[in-house]
Amino acid sequence: MGIQVELHSAGQRLEALPDPDGGSFDAAGDFDRLIPRDDPAFPLLGQVDPYGETHLGPTDMGSLITEVDRLLRRAKPGPEYRGLMRLRTMALYCATEQQQLVFIGD
């Protein structure tokens, strides 16, 4: 299954965010193959636990968006690109609404 990211508020998962491709979504995924391990240019994504949970808060979102934008330049059209776009949308929402992103590994 890989890593899935959910948006949480007060410990509850939020659903039905606007999808960049139209419609709505409630989680982001399909991009874990692109997550660089041990790369100092990706300090937040590099710390995501592929087997457990990693929580990031609103103060992390500016840096996370920068890292996602770098990965978007590497991603090919398809599921990985869509997953990164959804993650970016979630990070933008988290930064303004004071939520939390939860990365859930296998």
Residue map of PLM features:
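Acidic (Asp/Glu-rich) sequence patches and key acidic residues
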Residues: 1-106
